[in-house]
Structure formats: structure tokens, C-alpha cells
């Protein structure tokens, strides 16, 4: 349906199931957790500053905005798409976070303790942590952030440019 989820307060809300609502998701406080991105329906996701969206797997096709953060948890793969402009950063606690384009990762820092796979674009975000970076796809990926990550860097295809 056309309904929406509005998460408020400082506690955690866990959303399950393959939901089909289209009115969007607003996280104004605390953490909204879902094992699979399909639990978020098809509307935009707005994450307020100091709020979090925690996901483990699936494909996040929703546009993500706001000052909040995305947390990738669990050992599975989460794929993010779209030109997302959330600014609270991204934390990868485990598993793999895949973005075909760097624009899908918002503008905040990326704390990586898992695997970050990026296809193309300019990754302006600061990348830190012990996790690895994998360049995928035939395109060109430019790293222009003030990076200090200690994990491996692997190029499976295309070109990786370290600009800073």
C-alpha cells in the first residue's frame, strides 16, 4: 500500500518480511533494523542525524537521504544503488557492502571492518578500518578521500586511481 513507516524514539525497531509499502521510511531517532532490504518497501528512506538504518542483506533500491548513518551488519552481501545523499556515514561491521557507483555511498566517512566493493565513480568519502576494498566492474574508480584503511585493495576489473 501507500503507507509509510515512521521510526521515532531512541530504541531499536526491527522490521521483518518482504514489505511492499510505497510511502517511504523515516527514521527520526534510534535504529531501524532489518535483515533484508526488501523489508523497507519501495519509498525513499530519510535518516535523521544521529539515527541509524541497519541492514544485513538484499538490494537497497530506495533513495537514502538525511544526516543519519547506514550500518551493514552480518556476514551476507548488501547491495546499495541510486544516488544517495545521506551524510552520517557508513559502518560495515561484517560481510560485503556492494555499490555499483560511489554515489550510492552518501557523503560521510566509511568505517569498514568487512568488504567494500565499488564499481565506478569518485569515492570522496574517507575510508578507514581494517576491512578490504574491492574495485569491481569495467569502469574507473577514483579514491579522493583522506583514506587510512589497513585492509587489502583488490582490482578485479577496470581502473583504480588513487588521487590523494
Where are these regions (language model features)?
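Surface-exposed loop/turn positions within long extracellular repeat scaffolds
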Residues: 1, 12-67, 80-130, 143-164
